[in-house]
């Protein structure tokens, strides 16, 4: 197969998924649900609708995911103090622990994958990835 950016991103995604799988099983959470925990950890007090938009999930999938995270004790849902019609999501202690674990897992994987690069090369790589992430075309592809 021709070596394209899509090829490499697919390979890295598969590798990252396999790397995380066993550690996440110990935490009792899937990689898909972990992204919900990460967003709530970064934006405590977010709404379910905001969460769905941020992780690019439809509202039905987001609702099922939130229910699963509630049942498994990773998050809690409360009424907004000022707008009682709105519910806000926050992490529980278990969720906080998982959020911290995710942070260390992501850095551990980065360290392993990028170990052959010099510091300057890593900076260049991240600069290029950030530039790609900001392009209009990249976002259009992600929405399809």
Curated annotation (Swiss-Prot):
DNA-binding region: 48-71
Gene Ontology MF, one: DNA binding
InterPro entries with a match to the protein in the record: BilQ, HTH_MarR-typ, Tscrpt_reg_MarR-type_CS, WH-like_DNA-bd_sf, WH_DNA-bd_sf
SUPFAM superfamilies per UniProt: Winged helix' DNA-binding domain (SSF46785)
UniProt domain HTH marR-type: residue ranges: 1-134
One Pfam assignment: MarR
Coiled coil: none
Sorted UniProt keywords: DNA-binding, Transcription, Transcription regulation
Transmembrane segments: none
Superkingdom as given in the UniProt entry: Bacteria
PANTHER family with a match to the protein in the record: TRANSCRIPTIONAL REGULATOR, MARR, TRANSCRIPTIONAL REPRESSOR OF EMRAB OPERON
Primary role: Transcription regulator that regulates expression of the bilirubin reductase operon (bilQ, bilR and bilS).
Record NCBIfam families: bilirub_TF_BilQ
Record-given protein name: HTH-type transcriptional regulator BilQ
């Amino acid at each position: 197969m021709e070596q394209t950016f899509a090829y490499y991103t697919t390979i890295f995604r598969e590798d990252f998924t396999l790397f995380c799988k066993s550690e996440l099983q110990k935490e009792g959470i899937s990689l898909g649900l972990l992204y919900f925990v990460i967003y709530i950890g970064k934006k405590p007090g977010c709404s379910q609708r905001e969460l769905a938009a941020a992780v690019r999930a439809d509202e039905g999938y987001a609702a099922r995911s939130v229910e699963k995270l509630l049942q498994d004790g990773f998050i809690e849902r409360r009424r907004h103090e000022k707008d009682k019609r709105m519910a806000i999501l926050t992490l529980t202690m278990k969720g906080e622990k998982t959020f911290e674990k995710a942070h260390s897992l992501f850095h551990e994987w980065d360290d392993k994958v990028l170990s052959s690069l010099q510091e300057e090369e890593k900076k260049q790589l991240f600069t290029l990835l950030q530039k790609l992430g900001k392009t209009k075309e990249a976002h259009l592809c992600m929405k399809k």
